[in-house]
């Protein structure tokens, strides 16, 4: 099974896989889901998936939740799909592990 993130220590970047549920009651990251033998973090977002509103809210939410700059968060795959790959730039591996471990239950 593929894990939901990959970290590149030379560039201090991480790729994370998310399963996004737009139009939710609250913004929330909750545990994992496995699809086609790939792990995804489950992410609920209040915004509707129209005109990039949900994608924008994803970036805003992750930046606030993880105390990162919005400019260091980029959706690189899945702009119009619920399965998204998100690039996190300028992140320390220890800090990334701290974030990830907070969602492992």
From Swiss-Prot:
Any matching Pfam family: DUF167
In terms of superkingdom, the source organism counts as Bacteria
Q: Name one GO cellular component term.
A: cytoplasm
Q: What residue ranges are annotated as transmembrane?
A: none
Matching entries from NCBIfam families are given as: DUF167 family protein, PRK01530.1
What family classification does the UniProt entry report for this protein?
Answer: Belongs to the UPF0235 family.
- Tell me what this protein is called: UPF0235 protein A1G_07140
